Amino acid sequence: MTEFLPFVARHIGPRHEDERAMLAALGLPSMETLITQAVPASIRLNRALNLPAALSEADALAELGTIMGRNVVKKSFIGAGYHGVHTPPVIQRNLFENPAWYTAYTPYQSEISQGRLELLFHFQTLVAELTGLPVACASLLDEATAVAEAIGVACRHHRDKRSRILLAGELHPQTVDVVNTRAEPLGWEIATGSDVDDNTAAIVVPWPDTRGVYGDFAKVIADAKAKGALVIAVADPLALTIMEAPARWGADMAVGSMQRYGVPMGFGGPHAAYLAVSEALTRIIPGRIVGQSVDAHGRAAYRLALQTREQHIRRDKATSNICTAQALLANMAAAFAIWHGPAGLQAIATRVAALAARFAAALKAAGVEIAGESLFDTVTAKVPGKAAAIAAEADKGGRLIRIIDADTVGVTFDETSTEEDLTALASLFGAKPVGGDTVLVPGKERGEGFLTQEVFHSHRSETEMMRFLRRLADKDLALDRAMIPLGSCTMKLNAAAEMMPVSWNTVANLHPFAPAEQVQGYAKMTSDLEAWLCEITGFAGVSLQPNAGSQGEYAGLMAIRHYHQARGQGHRNICLIPSSAHGTNPASASMAGMSVVVVNCRPDGDIDIDDLKAKAEKHRDNLAAFMITYPSTYGVFEEGIKAFCEIVHDNGGQVYFDGANLNALVGLARPADIGADVCHMNLHKTFCIPHGGGGPGVGPIGVAKHLVPYLPGHVEAGSEHAVAAAQFGSASILVITWMYIRMMGGAGLKKATEAAILNANYIAHRLKGVYPILYTGAHDRVAHECIVDTRVLKDSAGITVEDVAKRLIDYGFHAPTMSWPVAGTLMIEPTESEPKLEIDRLCDAMIAIAGEAKKVADGVWPADDNPLANAPHTASDTLATEWKHPYTREEAVFPGGAFDPTAKYWPPVSRVDNVGGDRNLICSCPPVAAYG
């Protein structure tokens, strides 16, 4: 009988014989010897992780299926920002469940990201068309955080000289909660009503409000304009297909959730939010913006634009700490709009609006008082003393409605609602619906044509749509094609067995505010995950709410802030951050109301302990926190980590441990044991949630016992300080991490960490004779990544790090992290999932590139005309009739000679003009009329 390999062996790339060969190359007798050399003995965990034993893929799927089977999936009419959807199967199968889409990284390397960049460009076009505003970003995390981000834009617009924010109508409670969390450390004054004064930075207009009502905001908008305050519309994007665009009635910004564009509720996420702004606000908008530029041969090409706004460049002066957003879900929303086209979207919206209007008419005829006269999809009914009883009766019939208070219920229709639902719901109120197609949306209908661009009219058949999505995917390089050796990004395997449950009905189709007794599967799964993450990190409590690593940072720092305040030490506001830190660290600290003081690093990359001590003592009366990444952002285990923590604690501060590099620690060491008080964990790095081409991500935080009371709360749970719209953030993708841990077990997780460290040290060993390895720890070892100093090529041949990165595309690779944390270098992280064959292929390519640079240095190839300077090479360029370069076509596209031509990746564009793209920003496709 065949003995099947356990999942651990499927997940880890190097075979046993490969491991022996790699260790031999390092001159080591065993893996334990390597770990002893690389990881300081002072931090080592000297016991096995106390986790359930590993299960096979089949058994883990069965166990999770049983757990999630405890969820009771009923049809939701709760609304409140979450809606039932019909995800088109062609999109679910060819995009959402396709590794070509979900395993890709954020598209910093534009030449190998043209497919997802193009679809994100269409997403921005969709948002711009719906809102009437010219500039949209390529998604934010959820509606609640998008509102908070828009408020931040308004305050920056006024150069922080205005701090009052007027909530002009009733927003969803979770949105108000997130806004209040964001407001406190930044000094925003949150007000309600209609009084606009000279200190008002912005008014926030819900369109519609949480009760489904479109209010009359004409006067408050006019007052805002007169006082110079910005107008932020929180608008339903499905309603906007049949209603006047917010820009037409005075909105300077519009935000909302694109969830109902084909993305399941998922018990709260992940979903893409949108943010659109007027042209005047372009350079202070948060998040990614996809812009159109040209490549070296003048072909249209897409790229991430205006990156100087972002945290990785501006740090504590950034417009936001947003890093990961929701690219995969934004692409689903764009595909949904392309699939249905404007007429299809309007048909869905009109049908939903008609159901709601007929329901409202039926209730009125039965003598039931409803809120407002103008509505789109939601009817709020006054039922004195009967709300719970009516909701219970609806529940018996398999439908969930919203209890707003003891006397009020809300019923929200969506594209899944039927005539049968309408009749059944009306009967709960003693009413009977009548026919008709009247809608009750306010103001002018959308008169102007919208989405006239060809892409929204060209893919009506499934054959066309399937091929469209395939063509886009073929333009990109994701993990399904090749290794993505990005340092600090942990692009490991996202196993099929981990991904499958995300599409299950019991995972995808629950409303986040469904009754607790109906979501016991989620309760068990999240409880398991919290306990396992506590064991892995050593912490006393975990919050799964933060829906990105950046939000985890923010949540952790806010926990520290609230802890100090509770002890009467709210004056503590100094955050010490090493100069080597990732840009989100200072950006998050600023958002948490802290002032950043930079701690120097020594020439060998380690934190300067004397500088840390001096600055901690200098600020001891006001020290709030010290943020440290471990292993360091330079890819080494610093021996002094425990001493760093002691210095901070001795001076009254808390230690924030950035978990970006947790993949080098799991099973070997635990942040809490090292001395950390709080740590965020990137589930989209260490724990196998895919990057999705720029999101989703999940960044839960673990905290020590004294910080547990200050973990994020949620209004639906009767607490506050939420950092995301839903209590469990992007809940549906937590099953990916549950599956990973359940199939690996404690021993498997430790083995994965060891393999990641081995792979990185093997790469450093193979390349160190050609490129300097910039930083190493004791015994000349690195952690799970290494910095390769390509500046030697610049010195000898004028070849830049960008030339090397683009040339790697010709070799079939996504470039490593470029110019971070050290300018002019590449940081390589192979992860444990890459086999030795692929690792050797990367090393061979890097060595071959050094050989090509030598030809430039020796004058064989001119400095301005060589394979590196001209990289990457497209098929069309290579097949051109004339070839005037001093190197051959074969050298251009099949470099090194030993690479498999059948596996060749062809970039769709040559090198993209970044400077020109920023100077001439184009971030949405003009309507057809613009070409007239």
Curated annotation (Swiss-Prot):
Catalysis: reaction(s): N(6)-[(R)-lipoyl]-L-lysyl-[glycine-cleavage complex H protein] + glycine + H(+) = N(6)-[(R)-S(8)-aminomethyldihydrolipoyl]-L-lysyl-[glycine-cleavage complex H protein] + CO2
Alphabetically list the UniProt keywords. Answer: Oxidoreductase, Pyridoxal phosphate
Domain of life, source organism: Bacteria
**Gene Ontology cellular-component terms listed:** cytosol; glycine cleavage complex
Keyword Zinc in the entry? The reply is: no
Keyword Phosphoprotein in the entry? The reply is no
* Subunit structure of this chain's protein: The glycine cleavage system is composed of four proteins: P, T, L and H.
The free-text function statement in the UniProt record for this protein reads:
The glycine cleavage system catalyzes the degradation of glycine. The P protein binds the alpha-amino group of glycine through its pyridoxal phosphate cofactor; CO(2) is released and the remaining methylamine moiety is then transferred to the lipoamide cofactor of the H protein.
Q: Which PANTHER family match?
A: GLYCINE DEHYDROGENASE (DECARBOXYLATING), MITOCHONDRIAL, GLYCINE DEHYDROGENASE, DECARBOXYLATING
What the record says about family reads: Belongs to the GcvP family.
Protein's name in the database: Glycine dehydrogenase (decarboxylating)
Can you name the source organism?
Brucella melitensis biotype 2 (strain ATCC 23457)
